[in-house]
Amino acid sequence: MILPINIYSDDILRLKAKPLKGVDSAIEELIASMFESMRNASGIGLAAPQVGRSIRLLVLDVSCVSKCEHEKPMVVINPHILSVRGHNDMEEGCLSVPGVQGYVVRPAAITLKYRDEHFAERTGEFSGMVARVIQHEIDHLDGTLFVDRMEKRDRKKIQKELTALASGIVDTEYPVVEREVVPIAKPT
């Protein structure tokens, strides 16, 4: 089932998500819906808060990205970054901030402890695009958006777009969470 995406300024995107205690049929269904929703929106990563669930769950599939065709889709539950190495600056975008891109400096490689779709504990080394997407999605679990990590001068360049999104002006090819936009009253 394709789920609507929460958009910039939706409160759930600023909450710290709660850990999962296990995987049941409802979580399995959510995981399948998250993959379907992510692919429908031409995304490469999606965190549960982006689809209205404040839990520490994310999915990613970077196999559509050049030089990443060999990468397998991943389910990451309750992630914890154990260590980081190096840094790189790369342009990012986000399904929750449609139409906005910006450069973000992130560690180039990470060691990650997490649980998989069967709730089995895993530790893995990730680099390149996979490491970047995991970090971007973990930020969602912590209530942080990529625009928060942009340099101040770069963020000023996108302020107009962020203001439009916050006021409900959203243009996407995928479903988004409907919200009531209350116009600001003008003084009489």
UniProtKB/Swiss-Prot annotation:
Function: Removes the formyl group from the N-terminal Met of newly synthesized proteins. Requires at least a dipeptide for an efficient rate of reaction. N-terminal L-methionine is a prerequisite for activity but the enzyme has broad specificity at other positions.
Keyword flag Metal-binding: yes
Pfam families assigned: Pep_deformylase (PF01327)
First-tier enzyme category under EC: hydrolase
Organism, scientific name: Pelodictyon phaeoclathratiforme (strain DSM 5477 / BU-1)
GO molecular function, one term: peptide deformylase activity
Keywords of this entry: Hydrolase, Iron, Metal-binding, Protein biosynthesis
Residues binding Fe cation, per UniProt: 94, 136, 140
Catalytic activity entry: N-terminal N-formyl-L-methionyl-[peptide] + H2O = N-terminal L-methionyl-[peptide] + formate
Database matches in CDD domains: Pep_deformylase
Active-site residues (renumbered): 137
Superkingdom in the source lineage: Bacteria
Cited InterPro entries: Peptide_deformylase, Peptide_deformylase_sf
Cofactor, how bound (note): Binds 1 Fe(2+) ion.
GO biological process, one term: translation
UniProt name for this protein: Peptide deformylase
Listed EC numbers: 3.5.1.88
Cofactor requirement: Fe(2+)
Record flagged with keyword Magnesium: no
Recorded family membership: Belongs to the polypeptide deformylase family.
